[in-house]
Amino acid sequence: LFGDTRRRVPRWYDLDRPVLQGALFGPESYALGAAAQKPYFNQQVSESLRECYRLFAQHTGREYGPVSTHMLDDASLVLVAQGAAQETARGVADYLRRERKTPIGVLGINNLRPFPAAEVVDRLKGKQAVAVLERLDAPLASDSPLLREIRTSLDRALESGSPVLEYPHLEQRELPVCQSVHYGVGGQPLRARDLIALSARLADGAGPTLYL
């Protein structure tokens, strides 16, 4: 900063291209903006995200979407996972089907917000039991974030669906049992043998939150 030469200082403000940053809102203006955010921004994100998935597939040849499935059509037990845990869960599902004839599949959640509620309900309806895998701990919370979204979606679909939110119709007999599963706490890896043991327990019904 001192001497014969100085580093160039970034031009924070360009008078030829003025931009308003960090504007202050009065209470009334802020309330109106918050109310307008949902119809003019939030409700458009899902469609924009689908278009991004389409363009990504067009450029790379790899198909992605809000959810992904693996051997789910005839499965009665489902492992719900996000991120890299999907690969481990798919490997376990392949092993259990091949070696133990267990009717198990995997549902991958690729975006938590906006939550793909209709797709999740459509793929979980009629299943016997669902293990929701989450890499976190949720002290003092009744449900962890992903499990809460799934249960809320199933409950809304159980209320005869919603034409506005496009929830599919769900009968009480089609409602799966959900099991909360936390893994990776303290940096522990997600092991295939743990998922195999979890799948055997899942067939007996849900219980308190399990830690892998």
Stretches with model-predicted labels:
Residues 66, 70-100, 115-120:
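Redox- and metal-dependent alpha/beta enzyme cores, enriched for Fe-S-associated oxidoreductases
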Residues 45-64, 81-89, 109-116:
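A general structural motif
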